[in-house]
Structure formats: structure tokens, C-alpha cells
């Protein structure tokens, strides 16, 4: 088994090919972590949620962390984003940002999962979705492979096309 630190560029590439992560936020010294779907664009992550604990906590403390990974049988990559929450309010100031977030998210299958599935029994009016951006302030990443995959640089099983990028990334940083 080997593992290697990813460059910022390679870490951002992992984000560009990933849509599910775990968002961590803190309020009153208490951490909270939840799954979120996101879309990466221009050094930011875009997502949405219905009103609730996650939004309340990020409003109180906009410093957040997102962990995202890609795991396969013989190789993996994981990144951690340190960033700042910014709510994209339904105002003229954020109109284009909200449209961008919506367009980026719609490109992903099941993009509304996690953020849009909260139930609100007895609500007279359905909750309004809250779009937000996480501006990336710092990112770290690591990748690795089994000893067999690291030794010969090949996979023992075929790699589906949608996962080819991860194998190429690993081969580019594989030790000699």
C-alpha cells in the first residue's frame, strides 16, 4: 500500500469529479457533520438545503469543512476543503450566482438528495430552498493504492469510463 499527498490542482480535480461529501460545521464548540451534494466551479462548492440545523449553524459560524472521497477496490483519493459559507439569498445581488448553482447542481443525478428531502409535517407553506456557496480557502488531499496496483500501475479489474480519471490521477503521482 502506498499513499501520496495531492497537489492543489489534483485535489480540485477530485472535487470536480465528485458530488457527495460530508460537511462539518461547529456551533458553541459542538461539531456537526452531514452528507451534502455539491458541485464544484471556480474554486467554490455550490449546494442547497432546506432551512434547518445545518443552515442555522453555518449562519452563526461560516467557517466550514467538507470532506469528499472516491474509493475503489484498489485505489482511493480523499480531499478536505476548508472554506467559508456564503448564503446566496434570493436578491438581485445573488441572482446570477443562484442560477449558476442551480445549473451546476442539475447536471448531477439525484442532486436534490440530502438537501431537499427534509420533511416538515404540518407546514402550511413548503420551505424555500436555500442555495449557498463554500468559498475554498484551503484544500488538502491524499491518494493511494494497494501494493499490487502500486507495483505494476495496472488494475486487476477493468475500470469503468466514469472512474478512469481517478486511475489516471493516481498513475500521475505514483512513486517510481
Each model region followed by its residue ranges:
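Short, basic/aromatic recognition patches
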Residues: 1-22
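Charged, gly/pro-rich active-site loop segments
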Residues: 2, 75-176
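Alpha-helix boundary recognition
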Residues: 15-16, 56-60, 106
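Short beta-strand segments
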Residues: 18-50, 66-67
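Generic structural signal for secondary-structure transition and capping sites
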Residues: 19-20, 63, 110, 139
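Beta-strand-connecting loop/turn residues
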Residues: 43-44, 62, 137
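Short acidic (Asp/Glu) patches
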Residues: 49-52, 61-69, 108-120
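Helix-adjacent hinge/juxtasegments
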Residues: 53-61, 65-82, 86-88
Amino acid at each position: 500500500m502506498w499513499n501520496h499527498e495531492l497537489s492543489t490542482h489534483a485535489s480540485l480535480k477530485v472535487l470536480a469529479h465528485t458530488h457527495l461529501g460530508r460537511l462539518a460545521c461547529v456551533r458553541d464548540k459542538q461539531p456537526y457533520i452531514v452528507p451534502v451534494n455539491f458541485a464544484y466551479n471556480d474554486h467554490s462548492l455550490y449546494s442547497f438545503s432546506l432551512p434547518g440545523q445545518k443552515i442555522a449553524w453555518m449562519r452563526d459560524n461560516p467557517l466550514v469543512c467538507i470532506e469528499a472521497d472516491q474509493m475503489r477496490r484498489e485505489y482511493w483519493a480523499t480531499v478536505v476543503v476548508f472554506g467559508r459559507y456564503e448564503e446566496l439569498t434570493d436578491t438581485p445581488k445573488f441572482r446570477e450566482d443562484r442560477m449558476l448553482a442551480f445549473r451546476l447542481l442539475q447536471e448531477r443525478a439525484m442532486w436534490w438528495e440530502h438537501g431537499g428531502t427534509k420533511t416538515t409535517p404540518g407546514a402550511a407553506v413548503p420551505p424555500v430552498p436555500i442555495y449557498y456557496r463554500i468559498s475554498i480557502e484551503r484544500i488538502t488531499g491524499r491518494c493511494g493504492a494497494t501494493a499490487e496496483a502500486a507495483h505494476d500501475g495496472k488494475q486487476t479489474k477493468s475500470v469503468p469510463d466514469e472512474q478512469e480519471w481517478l486511475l489516471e490521477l493516481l498513475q500521475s503521482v505514483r512513486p517510481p
